[in-house]
Amino acid sequence: MIHQNLAIMIIILPLVSSIINGLFLNIIDKKLAKIIAISFLSLSALFSLVIFCDVTLVGKIIHIKLLPWIEFKNLQVNWSIYIDQLTSIMFIAVTFVSSVVHIYSLGYMAEDKGIIRFLSFLSLFTFFMLMLVSADNFLQLFCGWEGVGVCSYLLIGFWHSKESANKAAIKAFITNRVSDFAFILGIITIIVYYGSANYKDVFSSAKLLSNTKIFVHFSILDIICLLLFIGCMGKSAQIGLHVWLPDAMEGPTPVSALIHAATMVTAGVFLVARCSYLFEYSPIVLQFITIIGGITCLFAASIAIMQSDIKKIIAYSTCSQLGYMFMACGVSSYNSAIFHLVTHAFFKALLFLSAGNVIHAVNEHNIFKMGGLINKMPITYGNFLIGSLALIGIYPLSGFYSKDLILEATYSSGSFMFIFGIITAILTAIYSMKIIILVFHGKTKLEKDVFKHAHEPTKIMNNPLILLVAGSFFSGMIGYYLLSMDKPNGYFHESLFNLHIYKLLINHHPLYIKLLPMAVGIVGIIIGICLYKGSLSYQTLTNESDQREKDWIPKSKCKMILVFISNVLRNKYYFDEIYNHLIIKPIHCLTYLFYFGDQKIIDRFGPNGFARVINYFCAVTCKIQTGYIFNYTLYIVSFIVVTISYFVLKNIY
């Protein structure tokens, strides 16, 4: 009973914090509002740790039916809380990172008048994310799914006086509506064919629908899984539906750390893992997931190399790492995908918040305009270095364990995407070293006054990062131990399903496969140092950042090709331009057609035309009202004459 109460409190506390700070924004004292937000989220994180230990040590699954929600014929849906191993580990990632971000925001947003509103939105997002991962049915999950989308819109556009922030918020919201439409269709199809939205009922009948073919090679289950995955592609920024994530960096940096690195963007990976009971019976969709994940991780990493905005580089890095996670799901290694999800939450949040420290200190996003900050911000440098090495996958940091397991699983499956994963590991190291060298090393390109006053942020911004540093170090070791348990899927044995009882072949891979990810990471580090350390001497040639970005390109016969490639990468493979010409402009033309039909035809001959007829009739009628008695006498006499004439003529004929 105690653990059930704790489970409820984990979810309710962020909601209560959001309601208090949101509704009483102009009444409550700012200091009290901050205390409420921080204390409630910290308690939620503490309770999550208790629940995690209980689920881990005792193996207990908590299922609480709070209240009946939908009852329609045979469809019955309850509002419930379902906590198994998968939910408990997600609770840890969400609440701990959210707590750190809340505390960090007190310093980062200290000068912002809307800080209480900001904290309210952050708490509301945390509530919806916890609702999403603790649902026991697809409809409740969808409520959390849409809730985090709305909060993302509010937080990206938090600085609503900036036009770029407003456009980014709208872009994120609309892009996700495209994928969410497929997600809704998937849920509707589940309800129609399964007659239920509850996980237990749907998963237990998965095999039945896998044998129900609607096309030659496609079953009903294939269609359901494909629709669900398209929903995941939008939320988790996979190739084609990724365009919103880099623009989302227009929001405050704490938002980027919480929503667009550690939590919301991983919701798609969580959904695929949760629905492993469905996806395992749809091998064709699993193959599609593997391909999309592999292409995305390489695609996003290649773009990150040529970006100059520090937050956008990390955003594309996030997109790339999400590709790794989906690649793992595609080869049925759901446990390593969730493992990487958790480790990634810690070191990527650390990278974003460390980048926030740099931006806060120098008020600049372009890394080619920075440099020499290692002596000014040594703690931030250390944090950024730890996060980068974890991202690259250097032992003993957490990324070494989780990324290694994904690549091992991909290798075991025989998928060609293993090669993509290895190339991505090299590119990851290169763009990580690019940031470190251009931001912290070499001669500064900042204005003298800005560089002179650059310093470490306050303790309230630096101290919370200790938790993320600890997570970047120890989450890998702990996770590796949990996955090494002598059960299928290790720690997640009751949450995940593998048709062929997939188990991590921890001791059965060749040694070179185990060492290859870190080896290529080291190679990438060396390449990055050679490229960008050497480019520092060229950076005094011009003040234009675009030229600085090209300075590393050697002067040779292949320079034209390299410049072309760099332009393609810098312009993000022209996805925005392609969408603008193929989708946006045709829609604008269609709107002009609708405008013409609405204004020139419907309105002109409809309500406006009717109004003109009435006005004309009124104008004619008004002319009769002259005010002269002889006119009225004439009208009366004329009427009498006409009437008498009518009856006389009628009698004659």
From Swiss-Prot:
Name the Gene Ontology molecular function terms of this record. Answer: NADH dehydrogenase (ubiquinone) activity; quinone binding
Q: What is its main location?
A: membrane
The EC code for this enzyme is 7.1.1.-
- Asked if the Swiss-Prot or TrEMBL record annotates the protein with the keyword Membrane, the reply is yes
One GO BP annotation of this record = electron transport coupled proton transport
**Record membrane topology:** Multi-pass membrane protein
Respond yes or no to whether keyword Nucleotide-binding is given for this record.
no
User: What reaction(s) does this enzyme catalyze?
Assistant: a quinone + NADH + 5 H(+)(in) = a quinol + NAD(+) + 4 H(+)(out)
> A Pfam family name for this chain?
Proton_antipo_M
Q: Which InterPro entries does this entry report, sorted A to Z?
A: NADHpl_OxRdtase_5_subgr, ND/Mrp_TM, NU5C-like, Proton_antipo_N
Keywords of this protein's UniProt record, alphabetized?
Cell membrane, Membrane, NAD, Quinone, Translocase, Transmembrane, Transmembrane helix
> Which cellular compartments is it found in?
Cell membrane
Which residues span the membrane? Answer: 8-28, 35-55, 89-109, 115-135, 138-158, 178-198, 214-234, 253-273, 285-305, 313-333, 336-356, 377-397, 418-438, 465-485, 511-531, 577-597, 629-649
According to the UniProt record, one GO cellular component term is: plasma membrane
Relate the protein's function as given in its record: NDH-1 shuttles electrons from NADH, via FMN and iron-sulfur (Fe-S) centers, to quinones in the respiratory chain. Couples the redox reaction to proton translocation (for every two electrons transferred, four hydrogen ions are translocated across the cytoplasmic membrane), and thus conserves the redox energy in a proton gradient.
Q: Which family does it belong to?
A: Belongs to the complex I subunit 5 family.
What is the protein named?
NADH-quinone oxidoreductase subunit L
Organism for this UniProt entry = Rickettsia prowazekii (strain Madrid E)
